[in-house]
Regions:
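Arginine/glycine-rich "motif VI" loop of SF2 helicases in the C-terminal RecA-like domain
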Residues: 64-68, 127, 163-170
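Short beta-strand-loop
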Residues: 72-102, 119-127, 151-152, 183-193, ...
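Negatively charged sequence features
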Residues: 1-39
């Protein structure tokens, strides 16, 4: 429905501009909806507060439509030396508002720990329903600074864990927030290891995140446009 009407629409950076009225569920998604898991870098790197605020906003937007679309959303943040499930997978906007009232940021970047935590949550979801195909959305600049142990390199740890997740062949988007003058391209390398769609954003926003999430689901046939 969206493709024939692209001319004249203002693009927000997606390959296909998607509006609410364009989205029609396939029969299975009408019954079950999609699961979106946000994995967010909340470390002391530039823009952490903006990232967290934008993800919180898009979580609320998705859940506001949950009665109609039956989508569920979860959120993991990583900072200092650990990753934390801030929002277990839910369809309740009231529950999300309670869990996401405070969004702490700062410290080192334990990217590998974040990926491990995401994989643990994915394992639980698959055990509940092997037919589920959750959408993982990783938001980071890729600059891991906290290793899994004293004798390993944090970037290599992260790339190794990214490759493990890539073996799942699931829909993944990596949103690169790197904004420094010298670009290391680590988030792009993560995306390659994960077999993920890659997006670089200069300024993160709720609308951009929502668009990327839906586009990633659409590319795997989970939205019918």
């Amino acid at each position: 429905a969206a493709a024939p009407h692209q001319k004249g629409r203002q693009s927000n950076g997606c390959a296909v501009v998607i509006r609410h009225e364009d989205i029609r569920r396939k029969e299975r998604e009408k019954r079950t909806g999609n699961i979106f898991l946000f994995l967010v870098d909340a470390s002391g790197s530039m823009g952490a507060r903006e990232r967290m605020k934008a993800v919180k906003g898009v979580v609320f937007k998705m859940l506001a439509d949950a009665y109609q679309k039956r989508d569920r959303v979860g959120m993991i943040a990583f900072r200092r030396d650990r990753a934390e499930v801030l929002l277990p997978i839910t369809r309740s906007i009231e529950f999300a508002q309670k869990k996401l009232a405070a969004l702490p940021t700062g410290g080192k970047t334990p990217l590998a720990q974040g990926l491990i935590k995401a994989e643990d949550m994915l394992d639980r979801l698959y055990r509940q329903d092997p037919l589920q195909d959750p959408v993982l959305i990783l938001i980071t600049d890729g600059r891991a600074t906290n290793s899994l142990n004293k004798n390993t390199d944090p970037v290599r740890d992260a790339l190794s864990e990214a490759e493990r997740i890539g073996h799942r062949h699931m829909p993944i988007a990596v949103i690169d927030t790197e904004s420094s003058f010298i670009k290391l391209g680590l988030a792009k390398e993560l995306a390659q290891k994960m077999g993920a769609s890659y997006f670089h954003v200069d300024k993160i926003s709720e609308d951009r995140l929502l668009c990327i999430g839906r586009q990633t689901a659409y590319e795997r046939g989970q939205y019918d446009l």
